[in-house]
Design a protein with these regions (language model features):
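N-terminal targeting/trafficking signals and adjacent low-complexity tails
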Residues: 330-385
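Conserved C-terminal RecA-like helicase domain
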Residues: 182, 213-215, 219-244, 248-249
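Acidic, Ser/Thr-rich peripheral helices and adjacent loops at domain boundaries
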Residues: 150-152, 294-301, 347-359
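Short hydrophobic/aromatic-enriched beta-strand-loop microsegments
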Residues: 228-232, 275-280, 352-353
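Short, structured coil segments at secondary-structure junctions
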Residues: 125, 228, 270-273, 344-348
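Conserved RecA-like P-loop NTPase helicase motor core
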Residues: 166-174, 178-184, 237-339
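Conserved coupling segment at the C-terminus of the helicase ATP-binding
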Residues: 1-224
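Conserved, well-folded catalytic cores of nucleic-acid-processing
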Residues: 148, 196-199, 224-228, 252-255, ...
Length: 385
């Protein structure tokens, strides 16, 4: 178990043994009650039977709870419920909170590599499988693509194929990295979103990494934009399902839409309705226990970079959906490491500039053309370490 000393693991084993001593008598009592129901004596009436059934269900619930805690304590030493080593899993205890209140405590288990069960349950029984995605491969790295597909768990050698994009990103798109929006300043972030939407005349897809910031930005700018004839819709704010929000956004070139992961990974809005994608910050992975375990098993910071590049590529992919599309991809963060720029298609111009300079670009809809992007060698240490 990560970050647990030997004494802690030993105490966990003692606690598991103590819980087992409580659970075993409950099991025996449950068996006796079940036998009493099956071979009921003459004096057992309907009410008595109902009380015994209730006691059985109550005992079963307590037995299951104790078993779960025993399993957790066993996992602290790196073992599963059968006292066998369990290196393929990550276990943790989490408190669920809503609106500042704690309402549940959960014992969670996930595969260290989710592709292992995927390969067993989906790939192995299939006659043939085709996996395709614009972000399956990280640059020219086929090894990462194979790992993401589950192919290493199969005995067959997969057939590999790649195709170049038909779109001219170098002359149809620009990446603008805005350097003067302070991180954590919601007012400045909202002001930047509002000014960008006004400069573009709508047609903006705003992507957030946190629902709280999305709601805060929407609350500050929606009324002002609406008065200017620029409707603003938002996932997690408007009581409309995501598919309908996207349809409304697609049908109104003056509308803009704010959202989170679902919009970053699955929106198809070609044409004038989507002219600009705005990302509030670099989409770093959340430093959860599960992520830290997978990070440690897959190369540390290189694992994080692969995730971020895939997310950036997905977000950028919302912008150009047909040969006639053009637009800008704006990142409101100066802390954008140059090593992540490979997420964008080769030849796409990339600029670091202030918000005012970015607004001039958006207002004129000017494109600098191939090879015009000049990027300062600015790096940031991954906040996950």
């Amino acid at each position: 178990a990560a970050q647990l000393d030997g004494n802690f693991v030993e105490l966990a084993g003692q606690a598991a043994a103590a819980l087992s001593e409580i659970r075993q008598p409950l099991i025996r009592l449950g068996v006796r009650l079940e036998a009493l129901i099956e071979d009921a004596p003459d004096w057992l009436d309907g009410q008595g039977r109902a009380r015994i059934e209730g006691a059985r269900y109550s005992l079963a619930w307590r037995i299951d709870t104790l078993s779960a805690w025993e399993s957790l304590l066993g996992r602290m030493g790196g073992y599963d419920g059968d006292n066998l080593p369990a290196p393929d899993f990550v276990d943790w205890l989490a408190v669920e909170r809503a609106e500042g209140r704690e309402f549940d405590v959960g014992l969670h288990r996930r595969f260290l590599d989710p592709m292992k069960p995927f390969a067993k349950m989906v790939l192995e029984p299939s006659h043939g499988v085709m996996l395709t995605s614009a972000t399956l491969r990280d640059g020219d790295d086929w090894q990462s693509a194979l790992a993401r597909s589950g192919a290493p768990y199969l005995d067959v050698q997969p057939m590999l194929a790649s195709a170049e994009s038909p779109f001219d990103y170098a002359s149809r798109a620009e990446v603008l990295i805005v350097t003067d929006v302070k991180k954590g300043d919601i007012s400045a972030l909202a002001g930047a979103y509002g000014r960008i939407i006004e400069a573009c005349g709508g047609g903006v897809l705003g992507l957030f990494t946190a629902i709280r910031r999305l709601r805060a930005v929407h609350g500050r700018i929606a009324d002002r934009l609406a008065r200017g004839g620029l409707p603003l819709y938002a996932q997690h704010v408007d009581p409309i399902d995501t598919g309908t929000l996207v349809d409304i956004f697609r049908d109104d070139p003056a509308a803009s839409l704010l959202g989170t992961d679902a919009l970053r990974d699955g929106v198809d809005v070609p044409g004038e309705s989507l002219r600009c994608v705005v990302l509030e910050q670099v989409p770093w992975p959340k430093p959860t226990i599960l992520h830290r375990a997978r990070r440690a098993a897959n190369g540390g910071s290189a694992h994080d970079d692969r995730i971020i590049r895939a997310r950036l590529a997905q977000a950028f992919g919302r912008l150009i959906r047909s040969a006639d599309d053009k637009g800008h991809f704006v990142v409101l963060s100066s802390a954008f490491p140059s090593r992540l720029l490979s997420a964008f298609p080769a030849g796409t111009p990339v600029h670091r500039m202030t918000l005012d300079e970015a607004l001039q670009h958006l207002t004129s809809r000017a494109f600098s053309g191939p090879g015009a992007g000049v990027v300062a060698p600015e790096e940031e240490r991954n906040p996950l370490g």
